[in-house]
């Protein structure tokens, strides 16, 4: 039977539950435990797919096409596992499923109530993860903060789980904040005491308290929390703010959490193998020269909107021995000030995914600037589309008004257009091209050189595609279609041959990057940018016969 770790949060939101859960997963995996993870989100949306990035941050897409919480990205990166739609459950999904069953008559005329119908549906979703993944331990994060009215059915469900699967198979972890009062230099425990009491009111007694703080906490603070929370002192785990999120597993391991969890769950003492992770953290903290990379978007005020892109850039920088210095550039600011003052000091430009026409001309301009000045460029989803639009305007003429029908339904040159199967769709949620799809690569290209194989699978999230009516025209002018669907109908990757490194992809490679294994496209993009930095200017690099950039780039 699988065992379950339920992680709740108290005092304040955004204290680091997601990173804590991901780190616990890493500690257990390092001990040879088969782990899976699930996030329970109390919001009533069915998924975050239609939510504003300002409300929710990034929408993380799983291999099977689910639009999920950004915490799943942390889980995948830390544990190095591909999760599925089972790993993200929302109140909207739960109520939709229960109402559908009621409409079918599955409840035989019974009155539908939160208990037992809603809670049973939640428990069924939790159990499904263990059943379908074969995990020994399922770690379940409950979104929000204890005391939120939306979270009550989820707390009741996880309370019942201890009775359903046995007390020895369930463990509750509460992540809480210890505020530091600057005027007195004190760390206050009272909010944590109240949070633990609030959790007890719904019938849950925490087995472990993870204490988030900006500074290391003294032993007397741990003793005090252990007394009031009625837990072992070793179950009060200090977690102070660290330089890199990838340090967190090592901080928790040093505090003894890994061994404590395995002993409490009856898994025995297992020696962890964290050598590779320690090496990773050492490389992260080692001094490196900074490499300025521009990230051009319209949500740059909220970095969480592009969190997987940021992490993928950092992974690649770590691999290439540079510290990626991300310059957050608003595409609307480019529209106002032009590219030169904002982009002249960067050595690579990334335009990530997005929707809507706000700031779109700034993104198109950034793609054009990279093309004209020989700056390495990586376009992701929308970033590939704006690169296509920019190139088309260059080929056909600026007055052509080449565009995407997403931004101009009446453009005379729709080089980016609706996918045919999207034309009759009216609902927004869950209706895009979502999840992993195969892409066949063209030998002798940057893309093929990066991957080193003939076909790959990458994750998608889009409605619009490259318009094949313009393919021959643009190819004749120097555009290279280096990746396409196996049937040849969909253009997936474009690049420019006479350029240091200029690649646009219709998918989201950032979702598959790992700290120990950077995504090939990000790796080679940063390599090209680093080479440009070494040479001190932007100039074309030779494309060797096997499709790799010059040997100096690979150095």
UniProtKB/Swiss-Prot annotation:
Regulation: Allosterically activated by GTP, when glutamine is the substrate; GTP has no effect on the reaction when ammonia is the substrate. The allosteric effector GTP functions by stabilizing the protein conformation that binds the tetrahedral intermediate(s) formed during glutamine hydrolysis. Inhibited by the product CTP, via allosteric rather than competitive inhibition.
The reaction(s) this protein catalyses: UTP + L-glutamine + ATP + H2O = CTP + L-glutamate + ADP + phosphate + 2 H(+); L-glutamine + H2O = L-glutamate + NH4(+); UTP + NH4(+) + ATP = CTP + ADP + phosphate + 2 H(+)
Keywords for the protein's UniProt record, in alphabetical order: ATP-binding, Glutamine amidotransferase, Ligase, Magnesium, Metal-binding, Nucleotide-binding, Pyrimidine biosynthesis
Coiled coil spans: none
Function: Catalyzes the ATP-dependent amination of UTP to CTP with either L-glutamine or ammonia as the source of nitrogen. Regulates intracellular CTP levels through interactions with the four ribonucleotide triphosphates.
Quaternary context: Homotetramer.
Protein name: CTP synthase
Lineage, highest ranks first: Bacteria, Bacillati, Chloroflexota, Chloroflexia, Chloroflexales
């Amino acid at each position: 039977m699988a065992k379950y770790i339920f992680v709740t949060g108290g005092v304040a939101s955004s204290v680091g539950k997601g990173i804590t859960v991901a780190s616990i997963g890493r500690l257990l995996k390092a001990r040879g435990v088969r782990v899976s993870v699930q996030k329970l989100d109390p919001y009533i949306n069915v998924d975050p797919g239609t939510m504003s990035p300002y409300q929710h941050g990034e929408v993380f897409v799983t291999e099977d096409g689910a639009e999920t919480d950004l915490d799943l990205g942390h889980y995948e990166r830390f544990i190095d596992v591909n999760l599925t739609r089972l790993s993200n459950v929302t109140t909207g999904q739960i109520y939709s499923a229960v109402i559908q069953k009621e409409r079918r008559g599955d409840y035989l005329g019974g009155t539908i109530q939160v208990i037992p119908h809603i809670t049973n549906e939640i428990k069924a979703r939790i159990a499904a993860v263990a059943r379908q993944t074969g995990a020994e331990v399922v770690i379940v994060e409950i979104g929000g903060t204890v005391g939120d009215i939306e979270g009550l059915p989820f707390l009741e469900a996880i309370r019942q789980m201890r009775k359903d699967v046995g007390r020895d198979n369930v463990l509750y972890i509460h992540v809480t904040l210890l505020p530091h009062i600057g005027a007195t230099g004190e760390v206050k425990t009272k909010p944590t005491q109240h949070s633990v009491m609030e959790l007890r009111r719904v019938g849950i007694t925490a087995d472990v308290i993870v204490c988030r703080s900006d500074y290391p906490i003294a032993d007397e603070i741990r003793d005090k929390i252990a007394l009031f929370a009625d837990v072992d002192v070793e179950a009060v785990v200090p977690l102070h703010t660290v330089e890199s999120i990838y340090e967190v597993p090592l901080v928790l391991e040093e505090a003894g959490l890994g061994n404590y969890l395995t002993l409490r769950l009856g898994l025995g003492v297992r020696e962890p193998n964290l050598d590779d992770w320690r090496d990773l953290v050492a490389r992260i903290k080692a001094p490196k020269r900074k490499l300025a990379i521009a990230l051009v978007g319209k949500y740059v005020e909220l970095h969480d909107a592009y969190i997987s892109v940021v992490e993928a850039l950092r992974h690649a920088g770590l691999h290439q021995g540079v510290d990626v210095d991300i310059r957050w550039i608003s595409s609307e600011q480019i529209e106002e000030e032009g590219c030169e003052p904002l982009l002249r000091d960067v050595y690579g430009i990334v335009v990530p995914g997005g929707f809507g026409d706000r700031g779109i001309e700034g993104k198109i301009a950034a793609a054009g600037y990279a093309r004209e000045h020989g700056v390495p460029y990586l376009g992701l989803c929308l970033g590939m589309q704006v690169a296509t639009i920019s190139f088309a305007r260059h080929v056909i003429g600026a007055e052509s008004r080449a565009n995407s029908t997403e931004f101009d339904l009446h453009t005379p040159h729709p080089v980016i257009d609706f996918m045919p199967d999207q034309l009759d769709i009216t609902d927004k949620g869950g209706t895009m091209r979502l999840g992993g799809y195969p892409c066949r690569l063209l030998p002798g290209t940057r893309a093929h050189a990066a991957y080193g194989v003939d076909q790959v699978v990458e994750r998608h999230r889009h409605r619009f595609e490259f318009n094949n009516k313009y393919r021959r025209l643009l190819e004749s002018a120097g555009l290279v279609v280096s990746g396409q669907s196996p049937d040849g109908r969909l253009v997936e990757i474009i690049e420019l041959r006479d350029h240091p490194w200029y690649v646009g992809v219709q998918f989201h490679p950032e979702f598959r990057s790992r700290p120990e294994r950077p995504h090939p496209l990000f790796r080679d993009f940063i390599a090209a940018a680093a080479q440009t930095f070494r040479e001190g200017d932007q100039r074309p690099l030779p494309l060797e016969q096997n499709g790799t950039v010059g040997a100096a780039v690979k150095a």
